[in-house]
From Swiss-Prot:
Transmembrane domains' residue ranges: none
Quaternary structure and partners: Part of the 30S ribosomal subunit. Contacts proteins S3 and S10.
Family: Belongs to the universal ribosomal protein uS14 family.
UniProt keywords, alphabetically: Ribonucleoprotein, Ribosomal protein, RNA-binding, rRNA-binding
Upper classification of the organism: Bacteria, Pseudomonadati, Pseudomonadota, Betaproteobacteria, Rhodocyclales
Name of the protein in question: Small ribosomal subunit protein uS14
Coiled coil residues, start to end: none
Record has Membrane as a keyword: no
GO process annotations (BP): translation
GO CC terms, sorted: cytoplasm; small ribosomal subunit
Gene: rpsN
Function in brief: Binds 16S rRNA, required for the assembly of 30S particles and may also be responsible for determining the conformation of the 16S rRNA at the A site.
One GO MF term attached to the UniProt entry: rRNA binding
Length: 101
């Protein structure tokens, strides 16, 4: 089980990303619009740099929904490999069967 503080920090990041998503998208659109003068694009770059670091979606980390484990997380299920295996063996994951060939 991951420390509760790390799980809460990740949740706080997720909320920050959601809060600034529209503003970031607008600034990035300005930066990539080559029809605008260079000065306006530079101002947009500076405004983007002024946003909080945690507003960037790259800083988000996928964590297991049950344990908070940061590594080996399957996106489709939102679970780490260990818990996914346990639940699959108990038959609690619909459509998942043990491989045999």
């Amino acid at each position: 089980m991951a420390k509760l503080s790390l799980i809460n920090r990740e949740e706080k990041r997720r909320k920050t990303v959601e809060k600034f998503a529209a503003k970031r998208a607008a600034l990035i659109a300005q930066i990539n619009d080559f029809k605008l003068p260079e000065e306006e694009r530079m101002v947009a770059r500076l405004k983007l740099q002024q946003l909080p670091r945690n507003a960037s979606p790259v800083r988000e980390r996928n964590r297991c929904a049950l344990t908070g484990r940061p590594r080996g997380v399957f996106r489709k299920f939102g679970l780490c490999r260990n818990k996914l295996r346990d639940l699959a063996f108990r038959g609690e994951v619909p459509g998942m069967t043990k491989a045999s060939w």
